[in-house]
């Protein structure tokens, strides 16, 4: 019985060691479900922090490159003046997640003041750490009538 328990513990330990980190390889194409889940969790944490005026937390979720170029005061100013929908959001929904050239793009639909804003987030990975590089409001596709 002791051998069986020891064998089970060893198998569990070995199997947990063999798993690759989610962002070890950033292959072009759609994000894996694990990658998308981690990206969504990261962006959710940043949006929720902004909505709670926890600017230090929101800023800490930006990428190291972003933080080295933009100070926290400038970050707060830009978000407050141009991304009020994130602060006053009534919810958000994650759409497509893709990877191209080692960059992750996550589309997010944010509801605020009876409107839906489509944002495109760009994230990078430094080691195994995700960081938001930028977000931009995307315009809906317009259909041309002929």
Q: Which residues does each predicted region cover?
A:
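Positively charged n-region of N-terminal signal peptides that target proteins for export
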Residues: 1-4
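C-terminal motif of bacterial Sec signal peptides marking the signal peptidase cleavage site
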Residues: 13-16
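Low-complexity, intrinsically disordered terminal/linker segments enriched in charged
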Residues: 23-26, 133-146
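Acidic/histidine-enriched, beta-strand-rich ligand/metal-binding domains
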Residues: 39, 50-51, 95-98, 140
């Amino acid at each position: 019985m002791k051998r069986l328990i020891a064998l089970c513990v060893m198998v569990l330990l070995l199997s947990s060691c063999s798993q690759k980190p989610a962002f070890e390889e950033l292959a072009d194409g759609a994000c894996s479900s694990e990658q998308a889940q981690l990206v969504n969790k990261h962006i959710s944490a940043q949006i929720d922090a902004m909505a709670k005026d926890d600017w230090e937390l929101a800023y800490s979720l930006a990428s190291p490159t972003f933080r080295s170029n933009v100070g926290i005061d400038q970050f707060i100013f830009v978000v407050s003046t141009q991304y009020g929908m994130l602060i006053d959001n009534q919810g958000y929904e994650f759409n497509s997640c893709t990877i191209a050239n080692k960059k992750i793009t996550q589309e997010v639909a944010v509801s605020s003041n009876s409107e839906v804003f489509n944002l495109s987030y760009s994230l990078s990975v430094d080691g195994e750490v995700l960081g938001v590089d930028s977000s931009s409001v995307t315009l809906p596709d317009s259909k041309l009538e002929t």
